């Protein structure tokens, strides 16, 4: 009797800075069907150097690409973090140039909570903390950050990921990636560009994450 050939499952790894991002991605992968599975990893803070340390030893088996989702405000508000961010970007860029597993860095500025507000059609740049409490009916920001159902909250009652994506502007992005995808061959080449003059502008390139995961 012939041996059954095991199908190799490719996946994307998604390294999330904290609980909010992790819960968002984890719930999204359960609700939406993607051709390539998502494997979120909760880094639980630790700054940019924590990402770099983890990525430098992380395995690549069956991994199609790695996404690194970080807040940009640390680079401005925490001493020494700008240099750590530079090292992280240079490491990811070297991985992309070498033809290894693509590393795509998503920088949310100032943070993911701002991106969360963009899911709400009425949001016009108000204070993020107060807006989340008032509009999404949380008692405080910590309750929002630890809510495992945050993806559902941000995609019901008129709120949606699509509204958030429409609100983003490429000219405000600190980092962007040019991705060339060969869908049938499960291959992707990435060119990464960042501009320090744009660090501090409200925005995000999280649209690139959605563009890639829906391209396969």
Indicate residue ranges for each PLM-predicted region:
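Short beta->alpha junction loops
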Residues: 38-48
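C-terminal accessory helical subdomains adjacent to catalytic cores in phosphodiester-
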Residues: 2-9, 22-40, 54-67, 72-216
